[in-house]
């Protein structure tokens, strides 16, 4: 993960099938890291964009969460991640805001980024939560991301410049909780008492010196 301006970008490894034999706890470890990383970003007042290859649902879509969805989506919900980019299916799809794997008024928008190379895939299907779905079988495509003060503006275009989709995703910076100085009257009184005690000791010593004279 890294910061660029006011945005915190997180790149997740979702190739658990290829790595499971070598590191069976990969998803648990990555989810634990992600929890800490998003907490730090929230504390720093950063907006978040997540990048991951596999979508959080099975491919082709069958209504079930993929393994990475089971581990990562609860954390996206917990930290109010506004935008997640995925790939894998070589199609473009943009969901409504998602919370608890359900359409919601406020939640995470998931965008499948289409294809940039020559390979298309006719096995992808439109999800019930997709606002826009497009399978770029005719030519490659690309996306642009424009960061605005209170939103992320995403545009999807074909290589010839034809606009496929454009959307503004609400993305206000999280409110950073500041700890105000607490007035500890006890500590103040204690400090004042210590000052008085020191003055009393000095006065007592001075009186003893005068008596000795």
Q: PLM ranges: what are they?
A:
Residues 190-213:
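Polycationic, low-complexity disordered segments in secreted or periplasmic proteins
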Residues 49-50, 84, 188-190, 203:
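A composition/secondary-structure signal for short, hydrophobic, low-basic-content segments
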Residues 124-127:
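Small-residue (glycine/proline)-centered packing/hinge motifs flanked by hydrophobic/aromatic residues
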């Amino acid at each position: 993960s890294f910061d660029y301006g006011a945005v915190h970008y997180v790149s997740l490894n979702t190739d658990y099938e290829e790595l499971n034999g070598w590191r069976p706890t990969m998803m648990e470890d990555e989810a634990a890291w992600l929890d800490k990383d998003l907490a730090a970003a929230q504390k720093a007042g950063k907006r978040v964009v997540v990048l991951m290859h596999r979508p959080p649902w099975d491919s082709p879509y069958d209504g079930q969460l993929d393994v990475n969805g089971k581990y990562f989506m609860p954390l996206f919900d917990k930290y109010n991640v506004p935008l997640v980019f995925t790939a894998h299916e070589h199609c473009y799809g943009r969901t409504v805001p998602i919370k608890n794997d359900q359409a919601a008024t406020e939640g995470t928008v998931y965008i499948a980024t289409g294809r940039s190379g020559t390979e298309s895939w006719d096995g992808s299907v439109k999800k019930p939560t997709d606002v826009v779905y497009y399978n770029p079988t005719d030519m490659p495509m690309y996306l642009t991301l424009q960061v605005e003060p209170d939103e992320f503006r995403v545009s999807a275009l074909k290589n010839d410049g034809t606009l496929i989709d454009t959307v503004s995703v609400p993305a206000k910076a999280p409110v950073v909780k500041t700890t105000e100085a607490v007035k500890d009257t006890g500590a103040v009184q204690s400090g004042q008492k210590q000052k008085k005690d020191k003055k009393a000791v000095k006065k007592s010593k001075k009186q003893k010196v005068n008596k000795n004279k």
